[in-house]
Amino acid sequence: MPTLFDPLKLGAIDLPNRIIMAPLTRSRATPDGRVPTDLQVDYYRQRASAGLIISEATSVTAMGVGYAATPGIWSDEQTESWKKVTRAVHQAGGRMVLQLWHVGRISHPLFLNGALPEAPSAVKPKGNVSLVRPPTEFVTPRALERDEIARVIAEFRLGAENAQKAGFDGVHIHGANGYLLDQFLQDSTNQRDDDYGGPIENRARLMLEVADTCIAVWGESRVGMHLAPRMDSHDMGDSDRLGTFSYVARELGKRGLGWMAAREAQIGPETQLVDSQGRPREAQHKESIGPVLKELFGGPFIANEGFTFESAQKALAEGKADAVAFGKLFIANPDLVERFARHAPLNAWDTGTFYSGGEKGYVDYPALQTDLAAAAIMP
């Protein structure tokens, strides 16, 4: 019966434990060039004891951004700066993969030099653009032309190639949370009538072609996919949740991907879900289909959403996951692995600094040794 502290072979990557650092947008890259900074070097180095670090979502193209100060991987300058991050993580004994990202319609012309966001179909998402003040509604995106889709695939390939140059251990494709690949997948956002729309075989085509191009660069054992079968981010929805995600899991399994991750836990009384601002939220589709997807995929399965140490151990023991990813717990606890191992108290996260820029709430959370030393000298 595996535990969080047992090793795991994740495709070609050997993990010393099953405690994964989930991808976390923190808005600490440079605002203009979207280049990783020295702060990010320190941040990821501090968390290198994770079995695997999955980087924050990183845009493969300037047309794929939708938030301030998030990093990219399309330019030489970005790639060179990511080298500093991977070098620091590896020197600290860690492993790290890059999450490849295109936000699709979840953007705004203010991030795109006045251009409309691109999407499978011209379907406007409900709600406001994240972190923009005053509150600003999303706009209706433009539908990608059929002959533009090859360009999108090429952008993901460039991101995968640059991730290799930057020294990552693999790539993690962002197919979740209502971003571009998820928008193509689900029938509420994909209303196309060509070979990228209609039946699931067509709607999943782009996601699978992106997987194939990343495999061509890295080999299947160093590529993973991130899915969100709860469909509760950014105004998403599909008429056949189980059928849609089952098809994708089966197809990814046929390709022998190194791992699959799903932002979906079994919701129970102990589950504490919060949104990206740290506010409590209700879950849609409380019944998990993760175990079904895990079986259909057939490879290592990472679960993520509202897990505690206890619920994560239970998920592993029951065979519902092979590893568990933690997000906000890693924000506040750079030494989360050690704290779990010692059953030590956890730092509380500060929601006000999630996206605020600067050191505060980013690289200044105390490590356990610091806490213990302070306690020892207290009168």
State what each model feature region is.
Residues 1-379:
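Flavin-dependent oxidoreductase catalytic cores
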